[in-house]
Structure formats: structure tokens, C-alpha cells
Amino acid sequence: MRRGLSSGITLVELLAALAVLGIVLTVAYSAMVSGLRVQTDQEAITTSQAKLRRVVEVITQDLRSAVFGSITNQPFTSNDRQISFALIAGGAGYQVLPHDSGNNHSFRTANNVQIIATVANAAELDLAGRQAMLVNANRQAVIFNVGNVTQRGGPGSVEWSLVHDGCNNTIDYTPNTLLFRIESLGLRYDAATQTLYQRSGASEVPLAFDISGFRLDYVYEGTDGTTEIRSSPYLSPAGQPVRQFTRPDGVVLQLVRLQVSISAAAPSQGRVIERSFTGQVELLTGNKSFGIDEVVPCN
């Protein structure tokens, strides 16, 4: 009588099956780890991109609100790592009156301004102790701190006198000279701490942390159709940023937009993933008869 065939498996077959199983598990594990790594990387990238986009949106929104797109050197000197500009802090521009003498020299050297405002009292103006910007039709502006505000001509008068000690009007009076209540705003990047700061008045607060790179570019367009990108704005003889600059070859350049480039590094699976984001903002130019080409320092 013959012995029946064994229904079991041999040791070799068992080892082969285990080897195949090990290979399958290894492939599956590798695929799972790879998938998790891709997912983690994607989450880090998405988080970084969203963060950078929000920061750029905040910056560009502020820049769009700059008074006639004016770039200044208060509180920071404007360059590729920091920028200053003026925001309208409320109300429309107030009409400025000429001085009684009608002499521009007396207006330039005076430390007071008379305006027309249909308000019941000085408190409604909310100018005392605030910053103001004087803008003339020559496209010049000056910023000063308002001291006291008094009514001229008695009760019911719409004329008000603003005194700003320690700073003259500096610019000429022209028809259609206006005064705005403003707030000087500055942005500053500290590469050592990788922090972007925002300063308003004497207060400086962090705007964004863990920023690995930050750069500002000033985009000028020429009357000859050329575009020039600079790491700092053109300056006037007084050292102030100007919207319009005439090159030695006669080409007139106009500052039309700012480009903001920002980057951040995010940790992922023991590695660092760096992402960048760039945004541009068009600067308001006013119109042909009124705008700001230069914010001059008061003297």
C-alpha cells in the first residue's frame, strides 16, 4: 500500500512565503511612509504659503491706503528691508487758507496753519496731538505733529488755527493746498530674529514671526517705455524718497508700484522646506493737478 501525499507545506515553501510576505509588507510600509511624508510636506507647504499670503495681503492693503501713494522716511528710512508711508487717519482733506500777508515766505516759515472745517468744536477735528500732512498743488507735502487747535473769528466760525511748534510749514502755499490727518506707518524686517515689525507712532509690534527672507523692490516706469526696478527709491537733493525722478539723460521715471517678496521655512519630517511668495501693489498717483511726488522734512 502506497503512502499518501502529504497535505502540508515544506519548510522551503514556508520560508518562501514569508519572504514574499516580507517584501509585500516592506513595499506597503514604504508606500505608506512615502505617502505620509508627501502629506506632511504638503501640509507644511500649504501652511507656509497661507501665512506668507496673509502677510503680503496686510502689507499691500496698507500700501494701497497710503496718501496718494506717498513713500516717506518716517519712521524708517525706506529701502529694501524697511519702508515708511502715511495713512489717512480719518476725514477728508481740509482746505488751507493763505496767510494774511499773502507772502509764501511767511507761510513757509510759519509754525501754524489755518483751515476751513464745518465742525462744532476742536474736539471734532481730532487733530490736537495727532500727525497731519500738508499737501500743495506743487505735489509737495510735509508731515508735522499738531499741538493746540483754536477757533478763529468767534463762535460759529468755520476757520481753525493749528499750531505745530518746532516744525515750520516748509512748503509753499498754493491754491488747493489741503491738510490731512494722518498716521505714519513703518515696516521693518529684522533678519537676526526673522521677525517683521510694524511701527505706528512710538509703538513697534511684531507683524510676523519666522520670516526667513523679506525684500522690497521699487518699480519705476520711464517716459521712454522702460521699467527700472530698484532696491531703494530715488531720492531728492534733500535725501527724501521721490515718486518722480529725472535721469541725467532726460528720461522721467515715475514710481508706479512696489514689489514685496517674502519667504518662510517650515520643518517637515526632520527637514526644512522653504517657500516664497511675491506680491505687487500699484501706488495711487492722484491726478495731474494734485498728488504727492515728495514728502519733504520740516524745518
Protein language model annotation of sequence segments:
Residues 50, 120-123, 272:
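Residue-level detector of secondary-structure boundary/capping sites
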